[in-house]
Amino acid sequence: MAAQLNPFRNAFRLPSKQRINWFPGHMTKGMRQIQQKLRNVDCIVEIHDARIPLAGRNSQFFDTITGSGVKPHILVLNKVDLLGAKQQKSVLQQLRRQQPELQHILFTNCKDQRNNGVLDILPLATRLVSESSRFNRTQAAEHNLMIIGVPNVGKSSVINVLRNVHLKKKSAARVGAEAGITRSVGERIKIQENPPVYMIDTPGILQPSIKDDEMGMKLALVGCLPDHIVGEDLIADYLLYWLNSHRKYDYVEMLKLSSGPSDDISAVLAEYAHREELFHKVKQYDGRVEVMTNLLAAARKFIHFFRSGQLGHMNLDEPSGFR
């Protein structure tokens, strides 16, 4: 069968001289604090966004944290409701091809406290700790779990859900819908009485330099970077590129585009903004005020449709639908 030609862009390129990097001072401080506390940590729980199972995971950093596999390690892919159940098997295959040593992977949805993945975290961690050698630990009766991962993947939410499920207590870790809410390594938070289990929340940490532009755009699209670092217009353009390259055209109906799929983000946003009456006043150089379509508001709406799952289930790391 002949390969289907791609009528859209076959690659996404950033504007000239633009690079995606976000490594504020609190990340450097957080890395230092994490390494200082590792001595008394029994198990590493890595939280990541299920929609980007590969993008943004710094294997070198995690090797350092886990002592190249000496400390037990659980990978928790959160926000699985936005990935979808049908894609879980292929995600597991992707991960194990890239990182064969990964043995313990859970899918979680912190919006559902009865989610099996959430409920499996503590029993699995407890078993792994009991089976491992616990070096430099003076209080063997306690289990200390450290939560790590990139920003805005639900690390604090996981802690709060586990605390509520096992202790029936309210939230203890700050959460938010944007990257960078947790800015330092926190104190131990108790999440279980018997045996005593504590969790240590940590700030989201990215690679100091993101050399792969598309990986950076994936991180931006799911919200691991603050939107203003990259720009909503560029994030919306990458979303359009990704949807087209994977033959996912539900956005046409969602945005009510009259001309069908398009590769022109400016035209897409302009048509949507006009239809939804998204306008703003712009003062011109001569003092006149003109009413214009608000492309930024339209871009934010488009991104919201993706992040809320209204465009369907997505694995941003799946291969393109075109060859």
UniProtKB/Swiss-Prot annotation:
Record-listed GTP binding positions: 78-81, 152-157, 204
Any single biological process term in GO: mitochondrial translation
Entries under PROSITE patterns matching the protein: G_CP
Single GO term (MF): GTPase activity
Database matches in SUPFAM superfamilies: P-loop containing nucleoside triphosphate hydrolases
Domain CP-type G per the UniProt entry, residue ranges: 31-208
Keyword set, alphabetical order: GTP-binding, Membrane, Mitochondrion, Mitochondrion inner membrane, Nucleotide-binding, Phosphoprotein, Transit peptide
Gene3D superfamilies per record: 1.10.1580.10, P-loop containing nucleotide triphosphate hydrolases (3.40.50.300)
Annotated CDD domains: YlqF
Role noted for this protein: Plays a role in the regulation of the mitochondrial ribosome assembly and of translational activity. Displays mitochondrial GTPase activity.
Family: Belongs to the TRAFAC class YlqF/YawG GTPase family. MTG1 subfamily.
Listed name of the protein: Mitochondrial ribosome-associated GTPase 1
Phylogenetic lineage: Eukaryota, Metazoa, Ecdysozoa, Arthropoda, Hexapoda
